[in-house]
Regions:
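Structural recognition of the conserved hydrophobic beta-strand(s) that form the central parallel beta-sheet
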Residues: 46, 115-119, 148-152, 163-171
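Hydrophobic positions on the alpha1 helix immediately C-terminal to the Walker A/P-loop
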Residues: 6
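Amphipathic alpha-helical segments of the small helical/lid subdomains adjacent to P-loop NTPase cores
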Residues: 175-181, 189-259
Length: 372
């Protein structure tokens, strides 16, 4: 929920070239009033793998990866030209070598450390999985592939002290696990108790948010109970540990408030953000067969329960385990399709997700009907 916004926040907070804007960007916030010693101390390289252009062969992916990821390194040097002087790249066109050049220069000239941000690190590898292109996925994540080489450069930079942190966002820990020794220093924060509430809005935060919206865009607090019940039914219910707090989905709640404000306080006709709908291909790919998909959806749509093994609630797992039938509940949980009801059962968190699942259910039945 809001992964890219978090990346933007970190970029602005740690970028040394934005120190003059710290008060403007963060002055009225908690982190602005309680700054750490590290704010605005680093050189930022920000990657976004979601813009990766796909290809059906490894050479094409490698070229597209370099085309996309040389730019962020060049931008960092341009923004910090006061430190890089007359530095010029000698390996333009190769994202890993350009990053390595910058890190070597920074270390040898005792420059501030580099802070690397990678948004949607697994976007294009997940696309390979949903397209059933497992052989190409294996090529990308094994041996000396361009992706493993890239993360090896980052690992080396962290070890040598030229990189302060590499913070990645993504959907699944599968790719990170399958990279194995290429990047075996990653720490998965998703299920850490201190970070859970970053994944959504608490009840207290949502109440504050709603009261603000009502005051500014509606008739005032007289509608609080009405709207509160609506958003609890549709956007609440996410729990990321069995004993964790229930959270609102920040993305779809904000979608509702934006529509509510644009309609001058009228409840929008469409309560479901279309961006919430995970592609039906994920369901088909995950379950491997139509029968498996229907069995799984029956359990969720009809019973609203899918048993899971709490021991499987791990922060890392590989591709083989992700597609294991016994692991479906955890796989769906990581895809954001279900949430934890307790230590034994996953469930649909709210009416919005039930609506989405009903659409999946109907699509699969239609697929079956057409096949017959």
């Amino acid at each position: 929920f809001g992964k890219s916004l978090l990346v933007s926040t970190l970029a602005c907070y740690y970028d040394r070239t934005k120190a003059h804007r710290f008060e403007e960007l963060f002055g009225d916030t908690w982190i602005g009033n309680h700054p750490t010693k590290e704010h605005n101390r680093y050189m930022i390289i920000r990657y976004d793998f979601s813009a990766m252009v796909m290809s059906d062969h490894i050479q094409g992916l490698a070229q597209n990866f370099n085309d996309l990821n040389c730019g962020p390194v060049e931008v960092m040097v341009a923004h910090n030209r006061d430190l890089f002087g007359d530095f010029e790249f000698s390996n333009r066109g190769d994202a890993s070598k350009m990053l390595e050049e910058v890190l070597t220069y920074a270390r040898s000239h005792e420059l501030p450390k580099v802070y690397i941000l990678i948004d949607e690190y697994d976007n294009f590898t997940n696309q390979l999985l949903t397209a059933y292109n497992d052989p190409l996925y294996e090529e990308v994540t094994t041996n000396d592939s361009f992706l493993r080489t890239f993360f090896k450069v980052i690992k080396k930079g962290i070890g040598e002290g030229s990189i302060r942190t590499c913070f990645c966002t993504g959907v699944l820990p599968v790719t990170m696990d399958d990279l194995t020794s290429g990047y075996n220093i990653a720490e998965i924060l998703t299920l850490e108790p201190n970070f859970l509430n970053m994944l959504g809005f608490t009840y207290e935060e949502t109440e504050t948010y709603l009261r603000y919206v009502l005051d500014k865009y509606s008739t005032g607090q007289d509608r609080f109970d009405e709207i509160w019940q609506l958003i609890v039914s549709n956007y609440d219910g996410y729990r990321f540990r069995p004993n964790g707090d229930r959270l609102f989905n920040a993305t779809i709640l904000t979608y509702f408030f934006k529509k509510f404000a644009a309609n001058a306080g009228s409840i929008p006709d469409e309560l479901v953000d279309e961006n919430l709908r995970t592609d039906i291909h994920w369901i088909r790919r995950l379950t491997l067969s139509l029968d498996n998909a229907k069995t799984m959806l029956d359990a969720l749509v009809i019973d609203n329960e899918l048993p899971y093994n709490v021991a499987d609630l791990a922060s890392k797992f590989n591709k083989k385990k992700f597609f294991d039938k016994e692991f479906y509940p955890i796989s769906l949980f990581y895809l954001g399709m279900t949430t934890l009801k307790d230590k034994f059962v996953t469930t649909l968190p709210n009416m919005t997700m039930r609506s989405v699942y009903m659409d999946y259910y109907n699509q699969l039945n239609k697929i079956e009907g057409n096949a017959q």
